[in-house]
């Protein structure tokens, strides 16, 4: 019983302690919210409203002021009283240990303080802007009026430089003057915000007019003086070159100058209408066009020099190439008596001959046009370059064809010499095989030997044809060379096999008396060797038989053969 009482007392003390701590925390938060409320009440909203109220307000400014004052009245008469009630509710809930209700109330207070602070910020910000606007308007209006007066004076003193744009500029200035009068009227009435907007617009308009007054004189100078003078100089240069014999009708300068004059008239209208960007673009484009005409005249002068420098050399090239072509024609006639010339090859010559005739005709026409002054030198230059390029191509193709004709005789002699060489090679090969003392020659080799002779016969027969077809000769020549190579390889292989068979059988004889199977297979190999001359097959049988008795023996025999060591010395 005693311990239960002690436990109960401890629980009571703990509850009271916890309640005290929570109560203290809530009072601390309520005090912080109270301090924030006091700080908001101390903000100088009423003072600022009083300052602005002393100003003479009308229109938009007055409407804004009334909205700010209504907003403050709402704060004073509704929001702050509501805030006080919720603060009181929070204190009461804390005193009664209704901590959850107290927390809700405290959260509501925080939200209400945020709303009040935001509303007060809007009021003070608007009032401050209005006061600054009134002061700034006063300063900027003086500066704006001074700048306007300067523009007026500049128009009076420099108006002659503005030409026909002067009435438009004066109209703009009159409109700005009316705007400034409206500014004064609105300021007197107390509508400072709307007056501020007028000042800003007038400042921007004056900047535009000032920039226009800077650009207009130079644009008028371009359209009235510089561009007309440039066109006059262009025409003078054009006419001087025509007097010197240049053909320039392709430029159609009269038509182009008339068009450019119309462009200048259009640019002047753009300047008068103050479309200065478009006018500047037009001036730049027209200068570029005039520069292009000068480039054309300069190109014609350079082309004339080129034509005078290259006309005679081109004529000489034509004559030389014509002589080469005639000589090639004679060479073709002579060659055709001995050799067959393919139609494709003749077509190449005929094509180059036609190109040469065309180049000659173009040159004659060009010469006539230059003499009569009916062609621009630039066009004449292009034609000369085309003729020169054609002559280079013709020369290359005809030289190549001439070399092919000259090579026919050379190729014929080489083919005849090679046919003789191949016959000697066969005789040499036959003698070599005789020295080997072969048991005989297999049918396969004899067939190749016969075919080789037929290939040389075909080549020699082809070389006796009239006219001689060197393409066919080359084909037969190639076949004969391939056959000789094949025959030589077969002969070398056959002689190699014979030597190896002899070495293998000689080495295998050491086992012959002791091994009947080996002896029988060696007899079989010898039959192929001596009777049907199948030396490769004889080698295969002998090697297989020997390897059954002594593995690796063939490698030893082969090595001894390559080293020219006697079989008897192989261990």
UniProtKB/Swiss-Prot annotation:
Instruction: Show the coiled coil region(s).
Output: 248-298, 326-374, 400-437, 478-529
Q: Where in the cell is it found?
A: Cell membrane
- Mention any one GO cellular component term assigned to this protein in its UniProt record: plasma membrane
- GO biological process: what's one of them? septin ring assembly
Pfam families, per database record: EzrA (PF06160)
Q: What's its job?
A: Negative regulator of FtsZ ring formation; modulates the frequency and position of FtsZ ring formation. Inhibits FtsZ ring formation at polar sites. Interacts either with FtsZ or with one of its binding partners to promote depolymerization.
Q: Which residues lie on this side of the membrane: Cytoplasmic?
A: 23-571
Task: Name the domain of life.
Answer: Bacteria
Q: Which family does it belong to?
A: Belongs to the EzrA family.
Extracellular topological domain? 1-3
Q: What is this protein called?
A: Septation ring formation regulator EzrA
| Keyword Ribosomal protein attached | no
Which Cys pairs does UniProt list as disulfide-bonded? none
Q: Which keywords does this Swiss-Prot/TrEMBL entry list?
A: Cell cycle, Cell division, Cell membrane, Coiled coil, Membrane, Septation, Transmembrane, Transmembrane helix
Under the heading InterPro entries, the entry gives: EzrA
Q: How does it sit in the membrane?
A: Single-pass membrane protein
Principal localisation:
membrane
Q: Which gene encodes it?
A: ezrA
Which residue windows are transmembrane per the record? 4-22
